[in-house]
């Protein structure tokens, strides 16, 4: 059995690994490199213990590249006391950098004989592939190709009218296993450990309250109770929205 996947993204890479382990051949087609989304090195992903077990079943050992989180502390604005906390000696979840997980899965796939990938040069190539009898099944996880425009008319779009700011801080080495979220007046600010000396920052705020990079850094310094910050990485920002077709 052969399956065709459209889109070079984390979803399709993990799906490819699962399918191949089940004895199914995969051919991944994606837009040319200059059309692929730029890699965001600040982006992180949270994985539950069940997620980790599932991935390990398909030879994807995320624990080697992720940070185990065993505590979660929640604070209200300037309060020094938590209003809610979770503690588990084993682990509550893992945090891993998105690009590290992407690279890890992709390197494994490149070694598999049942995995192939090709560039798509123009829109008409998508339609030609759909007519080919080589594949028993097609999966499309690209949101901006002709397949969505031609076949999916009931797209669900949701604009949350909010902006997220993300960055990573370098700090002193410590046992960094506690995720912290502070509900500031502007919006939630999260400290998400990604190693013993690096922590990811995520701040979400209504678009009407947008801030600049320096204001974001000052906000982090104001609410930081845990780290001796050495430096910030580039501060990225993006609009929060949801798209389903």
Go through each PLM region and give its residues.
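N-terminal glycine-rich dinucleotide-binding loop that anchors FAD/FMN and/or NAD(P) in oxidoreductases
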Residues: 41-64
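Hydrophobic anchor at the start of a short beta-strand
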Residues: 3, 20, 24-26, 62, ...
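Glycine-rich FAD pyrophosphate-binding loop
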Residues: 6-8, 18-42
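Central beta-strand plus flanking loop segment that forms part of the substrate or channel wall
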Residues: 49, 147-179, 184-187, 195-197, ...
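Beta1/beta-strand and adjacent pyrophosphate-binding region of the FAD-binding site
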Residues: 1-11
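Conserved Rossmann-like nucleotide-cofactor binding loop
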Residues: 11, 34, 145
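FAD/FMN-dependent oxidoreductases across multiple families
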Residues: 209-245
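Conserved N-terminal helical subregion
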Residues: 53-57, 66-152, 156-165
């Amino acid at each position: 059995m052969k399956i065709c996947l459209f889109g070079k993204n984390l979803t399709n890479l993990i799906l490819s690994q699962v399918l191949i382990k089940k004895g199914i051949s995969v051919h991944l087609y994606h837009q040319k490199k200059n059309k692929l989304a730029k890699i965001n090195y600040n982006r992180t992903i949270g994985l539950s213990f069940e997620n980790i077990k599932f991935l390990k079943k398909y030879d994807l050992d995320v624990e080697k590249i992720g940070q185990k989180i065993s505590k979660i502390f929640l604070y209200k604005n300037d309060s020094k006391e938590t209003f809610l906390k979770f503690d588990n000696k084993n682990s509550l979840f893992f945090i891993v950098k998105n690009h590290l997980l992407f690279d890890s899965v992709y390197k494994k796939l490149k070694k598999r004989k049942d995995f192939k990938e090709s560039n798509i040069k123009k829109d008409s190539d998508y339609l030609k592939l759909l007519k080919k009898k080589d594949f028993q099944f097609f999966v499309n996880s690209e949101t901006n190709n002709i397949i969505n425009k031609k076949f999916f008319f009931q797209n669900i779009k949701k604009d949350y009218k909010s902006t997220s700011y993300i960055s990573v801080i370098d700090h002193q080495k410590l046992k960094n296993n506690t995720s912290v979220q502070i509900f500031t007046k502007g919006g939630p600010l999260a400290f998400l450990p990604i190693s013993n000396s690096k922590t990811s920052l995520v701040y979400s705020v209504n678009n009407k309250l947008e801030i600049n990079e320096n204001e974001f850094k000052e906000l982090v310094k104001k609410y930081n109770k845990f780290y001796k910050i050495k430096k910030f990485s580039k501060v990225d920002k993006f609009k929060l929205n949801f798209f389903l077709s």
